[in-house]
Amino acid sequence: VLSASDKSNVKAAFGKIGGQAGDLGGQALERMFITYPQTKTYFPHFDLSHGSAQIKGHGKKVAEALVEAANHIDDIAGALSKLSDLHAQKLRVDPVNFKLLGHCFLVVVAAHFPSLLTPEVHASLDKFVLAVGTVLTAKYR
């Protein structure tokens, strides 16, 4: 559960990274594919080479979903309801992959904004990406 302090930290962090979120999402996705190669199985039709337009494009979608969740932090489930349906009913992505991608996103944020990730903000962002992953897998059966 995100505390009031966590919510404030997440909103402030996304306020600082918001304009670069798309680039960060692409880098996080690429990092996930390199670090956890088993995650590539969900993207057999993608060009998975470094700097691929498909990775950047999907990474931007991931980042936009995170921004949307941050903008609606009091109702993440409502904000991501359609995306949750998509992942549960059509894509059927293994839930562990959301944790892996969330971790990679935090690593990329830390690399680009090292002073932003104080221990408190890091903990809040970690709880936030876990909350997003929980929402995205809530409709799995």
Swiss-Prot record:
Keywords of this entry: Heme, Iron, Metal-binding, Oxygen transport, Transport
Protein name per the record: Hemoglobin subunit alpha-A
Sequence similarity: Belongs to the globin family.
InterPro entries, per database record: Globin, Globin-like_sf, Globin/Proto, Hemoglobin_a-typ, Hemoglobin_oxygen_transport, Hemoglobin_pi
Gene for this chain: HBAA
Gene Ontology biological-process entries: hydrogen peroxide catabolic process
Tissues/organs with expression: Red blood cells.
Annotated GO MF terms: haptoglobin binding; heme binding; iron ion binding; organic acid binding; oxygen binding; oxygen carrier activity; peroxidase activity
Protein source organism: Streptopelia orientalis
Assembly notes: Heterotetramer of two alpha chains and two beta chains.
PROSITE patterns for this protein: GLOBIN
Taxonomic lineage: Eukaryota, Metazoa, Chordata, Craniata, Vertebrata
Residues reported to bind heme b: H87
Residues binding O2, per UniProt: H58
Entry keyword Heme: yes
Function per UniProt: Involved in oxygen transport from the lung to the various peripheral tissues.
GO cellular component, one term: blood microparticle
Pfam families according to UniProt: Globin (PF00042)
Domain Globin residues, every copy: 1-141
